[in-house]
Amino acid sequence: MNAVRRKKLMWVMFTLAGAAIAVVLVIYAIGQQTDYYFDATAIAQGEAPQDKRIRAGGMVVAGSVQRAPNDPLSVEFAITDFQSTVPVTYQGILPDLFAENSGVVATGKMQGDTFVAGEVLAKHDENYMPPEVAKSMKENNRIGAVPSSEQYNPAEKVHETKTLQQ
């Protein structure tokens, strides 16, 4: 092999190696930004990883929204998929369309049995339900009337008190 061919071969090899490294880095970066969706039943069964960012979706349980008396930005509520209920804590301003008996998708991490949300997204009109929530409820044949706070599983303790304790 002469020097010119060797030089071209080396150039091609370095180019391919660089492209392969770039592809691996892009795939890794995309994987790090992926938030997996879990419904309330999957979270209650322990399928959601602890201390890893995930998305949790469901309907806000009526009567579960509680604000701390001395911290108006601290909110606790529960989400349900009509089979299980998961307590959620959130520190921040809730969207204007956030309401009980409406669909939400929250991004955050599991800490024990509580979902600590860093972001809460609410539905944008009365007929909208987040696609992940609608699919989950359809799979469980649970689309229908939204349960009140008395109808969701009372065996699952959501809150110890009606107000947050400091």
Curated annotation (Swiss-Prot):
<dbReference type="GO" id="GO:0020037">
    <property type="term" value="F:heme binding"/>
</dbReference>
<keyword id="KW-0997">Cell inner membrane</keyword>
<keyword id="KW-0735">Signal-anchor</keyword>
<feature type="compositionally biased region" description="Basic and acidic residues">
    <location>
        <begin position="156"/>
        <end position="166"/>
    </location>
</feature>
<keyword id="KW-0812">Transmembrane</keyword>
<keyword id="KW-0472">Membrane</keyword>
<keyword id="KW-0408">Iron</keyword>
<dbReference type="Pfam" id="PF03100">
    <property type="entry name" value="CcmE"/>
</dbReference>
<dbReference type="GO" id="GO:0017004">
    <property type="term" value="P:cytochrome complex assembly"/>
</dbReference>
<dbReference type="InterPro" id="IPR036127">
    <property type="entry name" value="CcmE-like_sf"/>
</dbReference>
<dbReference type="InterPro" id="IPR012340">
    <property type="entry name" value="NA-bd_OB-fold"/>
</dbReference>
<keyword id="KW-1003">Cell membrane</keyword>
<dbReference type="GO" id="GO:0046872">
    <property type="term" value="F:metal ion binding"/>
</dbReference>
<protein>
    <recommendedName>
        <fullName>Cytochrome c-type biogenesis protein CcmE</fullName>
    </recommendedName>
</protein>
<feature type="region of interest" description="Disordered">
    <location>
        <begin position="138"/>
        <end position="166"/>
    </location>
</feature>
<comment type="similarity">
    <text>Belongs to the CcmE/CycJ family.</text>
</comment>
<keyword id="KW-1133">Transmembrane helix</keyword>
<feature type="binding site" description="covalent">
    <location>
        <position position="124"/>
    </location>
    <ligand>
        <name>heme</name>
    </ligand>
</feature>
<keyword id="KW-0479">Metal-binding</keyword>
<feature type="topological domain" description="Cytoplasmic">
    <location>
        <begin position="1"/>
        <end position="8"/>
    </location>
</feature>
<comment type="function">
    <text>Heme chaperone required for the biogenesis of c-type cytochromes. Transiently binds heme delivered by CcmC and transfers the heme to apo-cytochromes in a process facilitated by CcmF and CcmH.</text>
</comment>
<feature type="topological domain" description="Periplasmic">
    <location>
        <begin position="30"/>
        <end position="166"/>
    </location>
</feature>
<dbReference type="InterPro" id="IPR004329">
    <property type="entry name" value="CcmE"/>
</dbReference>
<keyword id="KW-0201">Cytochrome c-type biogenesis</keyword>
<keyword id="KW-0349">Heme</keyword>
<feature type="transmembrane region" description="Helical; Signal-anchor for type II membrane protein">
    <location>
        <begin position="9"/>
        <end position="29"/>
    </location>
</feature>
<dbReference type="GO" id="GO:0005886">
    <property type="term" value="C:plasma membrane"/>
</dbReference>
<feature type="binding site" description="axial binding residue">
    <location>
        <position position="128"/>
    </location>
    <ligand>
        <name>heme</name>
    </ligand>
</feature>
